[in-house]
């Protein structure tokens, strides 16, 4: 039975795990790392790079290196958060054909789902390489506070990557699964998950294999990227004050600054002070300029204090929704790379009044939880029941633009709820059902998930027709809505696709693009291997010809030189098949060279030289027996 893998598709890093021997195991990628940067780059020659290779060239190729795309997934281009993100990244965010936020790289426009799919493909290949078999199914994690559009876009990314997404699972819930799998004592825990781009807080009750989420809250635009941005802002302002040059206008300088900021932030988790040293960061008429700046942990904490405090408001709301106080929490589990920061731990400890639990690996625990959920779905993990919740209230727009809730936030999923509405005007023969998600009282202030029409309602006075609206949320947190006229039995239903979102045709096209990229990657790999083999053979043959050329006749020498020239021409051409063909031809001729060299050596060895001494002159060794007993 094929394995189902668990993937943590992170803003900054991604991780893949699988159940092995009843325990989740994190799989190392081709570079030997347990996590993979969620970065995709398009090189000048059209090559697509994913993970560490993409990160390494980001400084020299900022326009075409896409990172933190998870913050754009499922978002509209005109969303204020998208506008804010545009100011933070060196690459171009553009308006997609459906009004969603897309990115531009290598002269092409890509949806965030497509870019995420490239990272998922890398995770899929990592697992396949380890397992030695094809992987087609996965459980993928998302921030608990992701709305329906963001969840649907993540599922689309999985489909584009060639994966059937069996379940979308919330990151804090996944972390709780990994933390509490072998713990049977009843506990109320808080999972504080501060990652690269998002923040979640979930309150759970765990015990006897049951993981019940009581409440969840969060901020989908709060994470390590924002901490880095504060540092970049600080360094850029300091440099502008000293040199009068705005580094944020220079994409290359901005990328160098971002990398330096991230490095400084990480160093200050273990050191009290660090130095940022960026020579030749820019230049003006007076010559090159260098950025050299010392930074202390206290400086960093002062800069990011407002961001850390921003995480406490969702914590308060989650506790209130669960009907609990901070003192009622038995354990606070810290998840996400940013929880390594001493100040974050200090603030959490201060709020909950207890030392947070840091015994889980914050970068890997979510993927491990996803693998456990995969094991549950596959039947490998028994006696585990996961009860998650919907993070935001769902409802429809009613008369006067009011948001009428159908399903309240923190309702356990899957769930289904129906309510009956009527018409607003006499003889109204159609109604438009507009579906929203959020907590505001007016529909327009919430996130519109989609709309559809129920037509063919028989003429009647207002308030007479009976229209039953049903909301159905599946275990992935994805919404289906239907409306039925009770009088005629006519029904209309939609699986909510965000007012933007990707259509099935869009996804099919992107699947084909992903396959094309995978095929191109294979061709590039084959070409690189063929080139390496050909160049190695050329070098070896040239060396042998140089050392032993005097031992072969002119005809063979010319044949070898011609074969070397053909192989070099093929290498310059870059075609894998041509390089392989010419390398094979050169190998055949090289064998003749080796044969000729050996024949020459043997002939020289057999040539008459000095006469060997006769047997008569050979003297036998003389020896006498020694008796040890004497």
Curated annotation (Swiss-Prot):
Keyword match ATP-binding: yes
**Bias (Acidic residues):** 617-630
> What keywords were assigned to this record?
ATP-binding, Chaperone, Nucleotide-binding, Phosphoprotein, Stress response
| Sites bearing Phosphothreonine, chain numbering | 198
Q: Which Gene3D superfamilies match?
A: 1.20.1270.10, 3.30.420.40, Actin, Chain A, domain 4 (3.90.640.10), Substrate Binding Domain Of DNAk, Chain A, domain 1 (2.60.34.10)
- Give the matching InterPro entries: ATPase_NBD, Chaperone_DnaK, Heat_shock_70_CS, HSP70_C_sf, HSP70_peptide-bd_sf, Hsp_70_fam
Q: What CDD domains would the database entry show?
A: ASKHA_NBD_HSP70_DnaK-like (cd10234)
Q: Which SUPFAM superfamilies match?
A: Actin-like ATPase domain, Heat shock protein 70kD (HSP70), C-terminal subdomain, Heat shock protein 70kD (HSP70), peptide-binding domain
| Gene Ontology MF: a single term | ATP-dependent protein folding chaperone
Q: What induces it?
A: By stress conditions e.g. heat shock.
Residue ranges, annotated region (Disordered): 604-630
**Summary of the function given for this chain in its UniProt record:** Acts as a chaperone.
Q: Which family does it belong to?
A: Belongs to the heat shock protein 70 family.
Q: Which HAMAP family match?
A: DnaK (MF_00332)
Name of the protein in question: Chaperone protein DnaK
Phylogenetic lineage: Bacteria, Pseudomonadati, Pseudomonadota, Alphaproteobacteria, Sphingomonadales
